[in-house]
């Protein structure tokens, strides 16, 4: 029995449910979808990676799977986000399709394409490769003409379905149309449908004064309303799984009504789904704060988290559980948790039970970007990596030289950890009291005669042996020196930190001195 068959991981459970309910499928289509109305934030990414994990679980069970990601770039441009330039210039495009709005960053063909490209270029870094479907192209090519006709022919039934979850005060009364129309003159959806001939032709008029009759087979102006569009796509793409946010899965929300429309109008059973919760952000640095108009996207998070560690955050948390992605000291804990899970998965750290081993192993498998690596990563705690980088002013080659026993299959992952650590230290959330710079300017710190004498003793007797003493041995020798002076160990160690980094405290002293090395320590203490 394979690990995915024995697994109790939520992605495997969902995959089992899909197979049970859709046993007759030759191919299992799983879908996600986002409107590129602005930066695709990390909360949107939860939908994409949730689908990816279920896709992987299905494939692990030998199923043929198609992963479709829809860009809803034919949605209307409703408002201008705060973090977008050329605000005044964009006002004229409000109420047009997003794909018709020019890119204010002047990098892509359209505003929509700019935001699509941002996430599309980042997803391969976390091992996600969906098939992209651009809804603007689908509508403009007339792909949905027949499905729009079906909706118009069944508009009264759709109206009844929508009203099923509404109270009397909010029921849709009067004439209802399950479509919106983009005027072919002003290109905005400020239109009113006047008539439908029950064949292919729709009559409308616009606030701009334009009006006309359009043939669904020849126009791209007509678009289905959201809940109808969603149901239609399930049928068109044969979708068997698609998650949705908690707002869509509320009682009587868009999923409930889309499910009925899919069943009764398009004759396709609604896909297996689940509700995913919101993502919080904790300890954001100033450059990423909402007050700075910044929306945190996937690339921002990958500045601090290795791809497999970022995946681990989502893999190890049930989708219906809210959690926060941290940029403060919790970053250290998250890396520690991932490292422990990796050690358990590779049998380096003994699990308490078979169940715990299987859980960690499956979480680790699903966290990997390209499947199981050939060997465990070179495990250096993130905190220690940060310290070594700061000692070497961010020089990753110097850090690699410090760990001479690293295997070639471990280098890529370790270098990425170093890059993330240095990003975090510089300007991505590390608190100031965690940061330091070695004092190698030759300027003396004012010290008492007793402390100065102790530093000289350390320089002359301990520093020459720093590279050969173990951390434990060096620590014992430091305490032995401290016992020889009347002020005690606390004052001596504070003085050492002041001399080395200009602060009253820092990394564990013995290990810190070993990383600095004999030559640099001797040079720094020689001014006393």
UniProtKB/Swiss-Prot annotation:
It catalyses: tRNA(Lys) + L-lysine + ATP = L-lysyl-tRNA(Lys) + AMP + diphosphate. One of its GO terms (biological process) is lysyl-tRNA aminoacylation. The keyword ATP-binding applies. The keyword Lipid metabolism does not apply. Keywords: Aminoacyl-tRNA synthetase, ATP-binding, Cytoplasm, Ligase, Nucleotide-binding, Protein biosynthesis. It is an enzyme of class 6 (ligase). It is found in: Cytoplasm. SUPFAM superfamilies: An anticodon-binding domain of class I aminoacyl-tRNA synthetases, Nucleotidylyl transferase. GO terms for molecular function: ATP binding; lysine-tRNA ligase activity; tRNA binding. Gene3D superfamilies: 1.10.10.350, 1.10.10.770, HUPs, Lysine tRNA ligase, stem contact fold domain. Its main location: cytoplasm. A motif ('KMSKS' region) lies at residues 287-291. Its EC number is 6.1.1.6. A motif ('HIGH' region) lies at residues 36-44. It holds the Pfam family tRNA-synt_1f. Belongs to the class-I aminoacyl-tRNA synthetase family. This is Lysine--tRNA ligase.
């Amino acid at each position: 029995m394979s690990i995915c068959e024995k697994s109790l991981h939520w992605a495997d459970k969902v995959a089992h449910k899909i197979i049970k309910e859709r046993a007759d499928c030759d191919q299992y289509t799983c879908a996600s979808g986002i409107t590129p109305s602005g930066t695709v934030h990390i909360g949107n990414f939860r939908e994409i990676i949730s689908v990816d994990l279920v896709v992987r679980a299905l494939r692990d069970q030998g199923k043929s799977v198609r992963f479709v990601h829809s860009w809803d770039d034919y949605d209307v441009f409703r408002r201008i986000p705060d973090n977008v330039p050329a605000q005044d210039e964009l006002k004229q495009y409000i109420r047009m399709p997003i794909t018709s709005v020019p890119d204010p960053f002047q990098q892509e063909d359209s505003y929509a394409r700019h935001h699509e490209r941002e996430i599309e270029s980042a997803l391969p870094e976390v091992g996600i490769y969906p098939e992209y479907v651009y809804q603007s192209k689908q509508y403009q090519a007339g792909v949905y003409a027949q499905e729009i006709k079906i909706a118009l022919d069944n508009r009264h039934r759709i109206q009844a379905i929508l009203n099923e979850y509404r109270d009397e005060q909010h029921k849709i009364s009067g004439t209802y149309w399950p479509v919106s129309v983009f005027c072919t003159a002003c290109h905005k959806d400020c239109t009113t449908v006047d008539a439908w001939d029950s064949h292919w032709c729709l009559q409308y008029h616009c606030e701009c004064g334009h009006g006309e009759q359009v043939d669904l087979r020849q126009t791209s102006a007509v678009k289905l309303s959201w809940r109808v569009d969603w149901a239609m796509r399930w049928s068109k793409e044969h979708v068997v799984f698609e998650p949705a946010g908690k707002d869509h899965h509320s009682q009587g929300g868009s999923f409930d009504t889309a499910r009925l429309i899919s069943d009764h109008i398009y004759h396709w059973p609604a896909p297996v789904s689940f509700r995913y919760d919101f993502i919080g952000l904790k300890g954001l640095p100033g450059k990423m704060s909402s007050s700075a108009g910044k929306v945190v996207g996937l690339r921002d998070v990958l500045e601090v988290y290795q791809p497999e560690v970022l995946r681990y955050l989502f893999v190890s948390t049930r989708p219906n559980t809210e959690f926060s992605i941290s940029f403060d000291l919790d970053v250290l804990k998250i890396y520690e948790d991932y490292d422990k899970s990796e050690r358990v998965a590779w049998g380096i750290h003994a699990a308490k039970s078979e169940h715990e081993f299987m859980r960690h192993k499956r979480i680790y498998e699903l966290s990997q970007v390209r499947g199981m690596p050939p060997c465990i990563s070179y495990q250096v705690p993130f905190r220690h990596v940060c310290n070594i980088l700061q000692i070497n002013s961010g020089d990753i080659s110097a850090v690699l030289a410090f760990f001479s026993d690293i295997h070639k299959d471990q280098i890529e992952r370790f270098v990425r950890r170093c890059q993330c650590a240095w990003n975090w230290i510089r300007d991505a959330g590390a608190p100031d009291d965690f940061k330091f710079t070695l004092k190698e300017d030759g300027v003396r710190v004012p010290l008492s005669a007793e402390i100065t004498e102790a530093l000289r003793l350390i320089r002359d007797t301990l520093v020459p042996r720093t590279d050969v003493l173990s951390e434990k041995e060096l620590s014992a020798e430091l305490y032995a020196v401290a016992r020889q002076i009347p002020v005690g160990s606390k004052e001596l160690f504070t003085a050492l930190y002041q001399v080395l980094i200009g602060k009253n405290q820092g990394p564990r002293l013995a290990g810190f001195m070993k990383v600095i090395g004999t030559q640099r320590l001797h040079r720094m203490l020689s001014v006393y």
